A protein has these predicted regions:
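Transmembrane beta-barrel domains of Gram-negative outer membranes and organellar outer membranes
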Residues: 17-153, 160-164, 180-258
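C-terminal intrinsically disordered extensions
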Residues: 1, 154, 165-167
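Sec-dependent N-terminal signal peptides
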Residues: 3-14
Length: 258
């Protein structure tokens, strides 16, 4: 019950606010799972709801403390919707980001951050203590954007190190890449690749559901100024010996001002 109250409290804070006129719309801070170098503007916040396969749900709240620094928390369950015994993730997870270098015409923006929220089931058996898809952990990300005839085109890359999910014996740093392109003011296409270099030793390969990293794609629809609706196609490089198909998820992002 305490955990359910946490989720309801996050919702009540978020949807009880109003959006001031004349403000610029904050840039997206993530692709599908990959963090970009962008941060929420000061005084803005976002509520994200990720609906996973198996009835799982992750709810996250993030706030722009300054124009460079954002802070957030997330919490959820791998099987919130369904008829089997309800399981919660073991703890709320943190999301911090600070923009080190502003993007310019000739150079990308650079940010450092911490994201401890993984995806899928949380595996506690055999003292693994990790998500199906590990969190990014501590990361350094870079982003560069250009204007095209269709809209914005963004390229993103970064390196990360997960220090909270190492009981499986794989402590390697990781790499990630991504891009987003606007088709019109409402629709965007997102692509990303998580190399999953911290899931490729002999022990973790038996757990990994990907084959050579995670390739994800998504369509994002901004049908009103405050709201993104996203259809995700995750793990397109799935291991056919372990899973039958790639993952389909829905993500809803609501952005507002204090």
């Amino acid at each position: 019950m305490k955990r359910l109250i946490i989720l309801l409290f996050i919702c009540s804070i978020t949807f009880g606010q109003t959006y001031p006129s004349g403000q610029n719309y904050p840039p997206p801070t993530d692709l599908i799972t990959v963090p970009t170098a962008a941060t929420l503007m000061r005084g803005s916040f976002s509520l994200g709801m990720r609906i996973q396969d198996g009835g799982g749900m992750i709810l996250g709240l993030r706030a722009g403390i300054t124009d460079r620094f954002q802070f957030g928390l997330s919490y959820g369950s791998p099987n919130l919707i369904g008829d089997d015994s309800l399981r919660w993730y073991p703890r709320p997870e943190a999301n911090l980001k600070y923009m080190l270098i502003d993007e310019s015409i000739s150079s990308p923006g650079v940010a450092i951050g911490l994201n401890t929220q993984g995806f899928g089931n949380f595996n506690q058996g055999d003292s693994l203590n990790r998500y199906d898809m590990k969190a990014y952990g501590f990361y350094l990300s870079a982003s560069k954007n250009w204007k095209t005839s269709l809209g914005n085109l963004g390229l993103h890359s970064g390196v990360s190190y997960n220090f909270t999910e190492t009981d499986d014996g794989d402590e390697d740093p990781n790499l990630f890449f991504g891009m987003d392109i606007e088709l019109n003011p409402e629709f965007s296409v997102l692509m990303e690749y998580n190399a999953a270099l911290n899931e490729n030793n002999m022990t973790t390969e038996t757990l990994a559901i990907s084959r050579g990293g995670y390739l994800n794609a998504a369509f994002r629809w901004t049908f009103v100024e405050h709201l993104h609706l996203e259809l995700n196609f995750n793990n397109l490089l799935f291991d056919e010996d372990k899973v039958d198909y790639f993952k389909r998820e829905i993500k809803i992002i609501y952005i507002e001002y204090f």
